[in-house]
């Protein structure tokens, strides 16, 4: 496949992760005039500069898209979207002039600058087009059939491992509480692979419960999943009086927007220890669960359980969502460890939608680097995931949250 044939990779603004719209609605109601900057980073250290022109063409195409009435009607059917926000979406489109693509340096540079509400929906389609352009050039003979064949093998192994009798309990694994969710929009091999993988899972895997992608949820009648991303917490670093108060402000503002829904909190914008210190009794009661996105999942889960137990909260009323570089095998091991104690779900992305024979996956991100003209940062529970353009600010952030350098 030649990249000149790829005009129109993204053909719906709903082809995005659900949490982007959830955050945009909260921004619409609470921070409509806040300015932000987001920047692209390729963790794989692969040279993507040759794709700059093709990426720019796709950006121009995306800027021509708007929400169709049937898409707005679908969003209106979800109880947490409000009428004023949906009215705003009727006239919404992404502005290509806010995106700067530069392939002249030593690596591909992409910067998005504008009002936070205007730029927040760029991330998922932008990363998806980068991955698909690269796939079409580097792996022109790989197809969705290859992805499905690989997926079938993994699913067979998953069920075989689940049936294996555990030496300690002398029983096989009961999968009745195993919830699998597609988190594969951003770094998928291609749109075609993503769609066919989700279709296969929906038809053949009872444990498959839904997708983070609103377009697929709408067109396949699947349950959508998603709450908020790191950028919600990052932005609040510059939307609060005291830096140390930013996490609690972000959590409380989320509850202000969604008091009775979307109650999963992401723990690792700073790190989990710092998060749990801020996650007081009221917040722990009101949020229905936590999401893991970096660091050791077992260690993280045990910390979460210990936190809930210290507050005398019934673990069966809470959920842990695992979403960090998961495979089906990793998810099964985590499930075996926690399922008898607390509700667990598993969001799997790249290992579902970009796992093809001979294909090396691309690890790319687009993260907020400024809010209101000042730096923001993500530290996380994993050193390789730190994202900040200002070392002095990073030091300040660590000090505010009592984190060792």
Curated annotation (Swiss-Prot):
GO terms for cellular component: cytosol. The keyword Ligase applies. It catalyses: nicotinate + 5-phospho-alpha-D-ribose 1-diphosphate + ATP + H2O = nicotinate beta-D-ribonucleotide + ADP + phosphate + diphosphate. The keyword Acyltransferase does not apply. Transiently phosphorylated on a His residue during the reaction cycle. Phosphorylation strongly increases the affinity for substrates and increases the rate of nicotinate D-ribonucleotide production. Dephosphorylation regenerates the low-affinity form of the enzyme, leading to product release. Pathway: Cofactor biosynthesis; NAD(+) biosynthesis; nicotinate D-ribonucleotide from nicotinate: step 1/1. Coiled coil: none annotated. SUPFAM superfamilies: Nicotinate/Quinolinate PRTase C-terminal domain-like, Nicotinate/Quinolinate PRTase N-terminal domain-like. It holds the Pfam family NAPRTase. One of its GO terms (molecular function) is nicotinate phosphoribosyltransferase activity. Keywords: Ligase, Phosphoprotein, Pyridine nucleotide biosynthesis. Its EC number is 6.3.4.21. One of its GO terms (biological process) is NAD biosynthetic process via the salvage pathway. The modification Phosphohistidine is found at residue 230. Belongs to the NAPRTase family. Catalyzes the synthesis of beta-nicotinate D-ribonucleotide from nicotinate and 5-phospho-D-ribose 1-phosphate at the expense of ATP. This is Nicotinate phosphoribosyltransferase.
């Amino acid at each position: 496949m030649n990249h000149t044939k790829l005009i129109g990779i993204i053909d719906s603004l709903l082809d995005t992760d659900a949490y982007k719209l959830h955050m945009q609605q909260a921004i619409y109601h609470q921070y409509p005039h806040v300015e932000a900057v987001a920047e692209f980073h390729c963790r794989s250290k692969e040279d993507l500069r040759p794709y700059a022109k093709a990426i720019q063409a796709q950006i121009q195409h995306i800027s021509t898209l708007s929400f169709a009435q049937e898409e707005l009607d679908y969003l209106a059917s979800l109880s947490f979207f409000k009428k004023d926000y949906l009215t705003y979406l009727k006239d919404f489109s992404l502005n290509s002039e806010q995106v700067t693509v530069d392939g002249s340096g030593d690596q591909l540079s992409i910067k998005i600058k504008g009002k936070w509400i205007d730029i927040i929906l760029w991330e998922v389609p932008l990363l998806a087009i980068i991955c698909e352009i690269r796939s079409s050039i580097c792996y022109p003979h790989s197809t969705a059939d290859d992805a499905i064949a690989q997926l079938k093998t993994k699913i067979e192994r998953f069920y075989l491992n689940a049936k294996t009798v555990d030496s300690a309990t002398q029983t096989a694994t009961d999968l009745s509480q195993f919830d699998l969710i597609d988190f594969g929009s951003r770094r998928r091999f291609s749109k075609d692979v993503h769609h066919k993988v989700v279709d296969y899972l929906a038809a053949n895997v009872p444990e498959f419960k839904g997708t983070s992608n609103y377009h697929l949820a709408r067109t396949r009648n699947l349950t959508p999943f998603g709450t908020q991303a790191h950028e919600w917490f990052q932005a609040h670093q510059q939307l609060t009086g005291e830096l140390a108060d930013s996490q609690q402000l972000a959590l409380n503002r989320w509850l202000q927007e969604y008091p009775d829904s979307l109650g999963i909190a992401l723990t690792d914008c700073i790190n989990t220890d710092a998060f749990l210190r801020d996650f007081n009794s009221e917040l722990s009661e009101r949020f229905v669960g936590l999401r893991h996105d970096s660091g050791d999942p077992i260690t993280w889960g045990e910390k979460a359980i210990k936190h809930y137990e210290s507050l005398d909260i019934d673990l069966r009323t809470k959920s842990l969502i695992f979403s960090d570089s998961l495979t089906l095998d990793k998810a099964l091991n985590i499930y075996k460890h926690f399922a008898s104690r607390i509700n667990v779900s598993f969001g799997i992305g790249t290992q579902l939608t970009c796992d093809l024979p001979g294909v090396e996956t691309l690890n790319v991100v687009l993260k907020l680097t400024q809010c209101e003209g000042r730096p923001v940062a993500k530290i996380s529970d994993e050193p390789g995931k730190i994202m900040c353009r200002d070392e002095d600010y990073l030091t300040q952030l660590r000090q505010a949250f009592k984190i060792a350098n």
